[in-house]
A protein has these predicted regions:
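Non-catalytic terminal extensions of PLP-dependent enzymes
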Residues: 102-103, 205-206, 217, 221
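A broadly conserved detector of short glycine/acidic/proline-rich loop/turn motifs that flank catalytic sites
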Residues: 130, 201-203, 242-245
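A conserved ligand/cofactor-binding region detector
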Residues: 199, 204-206, 212-214
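N-terminal beta-alpha lobe that positions the nucleotide/phosphoryl donor
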Residues: 1-198, 207
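Conserved small/polar residues in nucleotide/adenosyl-binding loops
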Residues: 247-253
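Extended C-terminal regions of large enzymes
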Residues: 212-245
Length: 257
C-alpha cells in the first residue's frame, strides 16, 4: 500500500444543507477521502494562494461544489452485502456490477443522499476517489468508473435512485477486471484498496436539451511533446468549446437533460 500521506486528510463534515452552505467541499463518513478528492482540494488551495490578487481582483479559483463519501461507507456497504469475496471470483464486469446494484447502501448514507437530491437539481458527476488513485508512484488514472447523471427528474425519488445506482457502479468498478489486474502489477494486496466517491456538480449551462460549459480544458505543467521554440517546462493546455476529454475534443460534449 502507498506509504505517502494524503495531501488533504479530511474535509468539513457534510451538512444536509451544504449546497448553499459555507463549505464547497464536505465529507460524508469518517474514513479517508481518497487520492482524487485530496488532490482537488490541495490544488485549489495552492492555486488560490498564488494568485496576484491586486492584478486579478475578480478571479476566483475553486472546485465545483462536492461531497465526498468516505471509504468507511464503502467498507460498510461491502461487508453488509457480503461482496468482499467477489474480488477473487472469475466474474464478468457486468455480473459484478449487477451484484453491487442489488446491495443496500448504509442507512445513514441514504439519509444524506436523500437530503442532497431534494436540494440539488443540476447535473452531477459521480467520481471515483480510491486510496491509491492519483498516487505519484502508481497513478490509477482512468482505472475506475465515473458516472454523469442529468439529475433533473421532477420526482426526488427518481433522482435518488439514479444517484444510488451511480454510487454502486463506482463501488463495483473497484472489483472490475481492469482494476484488479492493475492492482496486481503494483504489488498491492486487493483488500488494501478502498473506494471513496465524489458527488460533484457539473459546471455549465443548459442550452436546449443539452448541458455543457462555455469552455473547458486540461493544463499540464510539463509538455512531453514540445516543438521548438516551446520548451517542455513551458507546459501545455488543451482547450475546447464545451467539454474536453483526454482523448478527443468535442464541440460540444453533451449531457442531455
Amino acid at each position: 500500500m502507498s506509504s505517502l500521506k494524503p495531501l488533504v486528510a479530511e474535509l468539513p463534515v457534510f451538512d444536509r444543507k451544504f449546497w448553499d452552505g459555507t463549505f464547497r467541499c464536505t465529507q460524508i463518513g469518517s474514513g479517508a477521502i481518497g487520492g482524487k478528492a485530496s488532490g482537488l482540494v490541495f490544488i485549489k488551495d495552492l492555486l488560490a494562494a498564488q494568485i496576484d490578487r491586486p492584478s486579478f481582483p475578480d478571479v476566483e479559483i475553486n472546485v465545483p461544489t462536492m461531497a465526498v463519501i468516505a471509504t468507511d461507507c464503502f467498507d460498510q456497504f461491502v461487508a453488509q452485502n457480503r461482496l468482499a469475496e467477489l474480488r477473487f471470483e472469475e466474474m464478468t464486469d457486468d455480473r459484478i456490477a449487477h451484484a453491487f446494484q442489488k446491495g443496500d447502501l448504509p442507512v445513514e448514507l441514504l439519509g444524506d443522499l436523500r437530503a442532497l437530491v431534494v436540494q440539488v437539481k443540476t447535473p452531477l458527476a459521480i467520481r471515483s476517489s480510491s486510496l491509491l488513485e492519483d498516487a505519484l508512484e502508481h497513478p490509477f488514472a482512468g482505472v475506475y468508473a465515473t458516472k454523469m447523471i442529468p439529475n433533473n427528474q421532477p420526482d426526488p425519488d427518481s433522482r435518488f435512485r439514479r444517484l444510488a445506482e451511480a454510487i454502486k457502479f463506482v463501488y463495483a468498478s473497484t472489483y472490475f477486471r481492469e482494476a484488479r489486474d492493475y492492482i496486481r502489477t503494483t504489488g498491492t494486496k486487493p483488500g488494501e484498496e478502498k473506494m471513496a466517491v465524489i458527488i460533484q456538480e457539473i459546471v455549465g449551462h443548459r442550452r436546449g436539451d443539452r448541458f455543457y460549459p462555455d469552455i473547458s480544458g486540461v493544463a499540464r505543467s510539463y509538455n512531453f511533446y514540445a516543438f521548438e521554440p516551446a520548451r517542455p517546462e513551458d507546459g501545455v493546455v488543451t482547450l475546447a468549446l464545451g467539454s474536453v476529454s483526454y482523448t478527443h475534443l468535442t464541440l460540444p460534449t453533451i449531457l442531455r437533460v
